[in-house]
Structures are given as structure tokens and as C-alpha cells.
Amino acid sequence: MGPEDDPFGYPITGAKGLVIASVHEDAEGEVYFLYQSSRYYPVNYTATRASFPYRAMGEVRGYGEGRVYVVWAEEIEQPEPGVACSKDDGLDIFSDWMTSVEDGFLTVHYETWWGDGSVKHRFGLVQGDTPYEVVLQHDTCGDRALEKADGLVCFDVNAFLPDTEGETVTLTLKWTTSAGKPAEREFGFRSRE
């Protein structure tokens, strides 16, 4: 589904025309996107976690629900947390709205060196020194460093981390930068109910 597939003239909404959301089913089995505690019911798409621009199909209800037309969607790579990489090649993480913890998912907007595009990079997320500390690992799998480009990866950390029992705790993400230096960033995390 690409940007050219939009048959409507509604304006694209969301931060910079794009949001990152989890895909769920409600009690009636209808698919919805959960984004910042709001439910958006797509009229044309289903997946597990995706980035997408959308067009509102009328008013968003006062309690954060509304029908949306998904202009296009791209599923985000979702490796299993707790699996380590055999190597840890550096990468840089953007401090932007896409790098976030929401709905039990850690989503990382990163930049790294890429070769010709035929080599798939691997990502691992392992437990750090404390219960709410995780370490992101990146393996280029021998890909040649020709140019820098960005990407998205997400991890369902809800079952990987201890239950916060309704409290918001500090989640620390650690990684190695492309310059080989250690880095970290903190997020508010609350277990998905």
C-alpha cells in the first residue's frame, strides 16, 4: 500500500503526516490502531505494528476514537526481545518523536551504515544490569559501509520487562554509537494492561 493509493482528498494528519502505532482488535473483533491512548479504526488496513500517514474520515470522538483512511503503511521490523546478536556494530539513535516507548513497545529510529541493500541487518535487545535497563545490539552481518541511512525497529518489551503494576517507571536504553562510544536514553514505561 503506497502513497499513490489514496482515493480521498482529506488532509494527511499525524506528526509530519506520519504516526507509529500498535494494531489491536476490540471486543467485537474490529481492528484499530492505538496511538497515544487514542483508537483509530482504519477502513483499509491490518498489521501488528506500523508507521503510517492517515486521513481522518470525519470527527475524532472526544475520548480519542475515530475512523481513518490509511494512506500507506509500512510494518516495522519486530525482533524478539531477549535474543543477543553475535556482534555489536554501532548505530546512532535519533532523539525524535519516533524513538519512543508506548503501549508496551520500544520503537527505535536509528541511523547506520548500509551497503547495497541486499544484506539484512540483525538487532538484539537484551537485559541490562537492572530490571528496567535494556541494551540494543546491532549486527551489520558483514554489510559494507557505503552510505548512512535510517530505519525503524521495535521490540514488544511488555512481557520482557517486569510488570510495573500500573506505575510509570524509568526504562533505560543503552547502545553503542557508530563512533564506538556507549550511549543511553531514558523513557517513561508502564506495562500494557
Language-model segments: which ranges?
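Flexible glycine-rich surface loops and low-complexity tracts that mediate binding to linear polymers
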Residues: Y45-W72
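Bacterial Sec-dependent N-terminal signal peptides
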Residues: M1-L18
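Short, solvent-exposed, Trp/other aromatic-anchored flexible loops in extracytoplasmic proteins
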Residues: T48, F52, T140-G180
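Extended, well-ordered protein cores
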Residues: H24-D26, E30-S37
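Short beta-strand elements
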Residues: G180-E193
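Short helix-loop boundary/capping segments
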Residues: S95-A145
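Beta-strand/loop nucleic-acid-binding surfaces
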Residues: Y35-R49
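Transition segment at domain starts
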Residues: Y69-T99
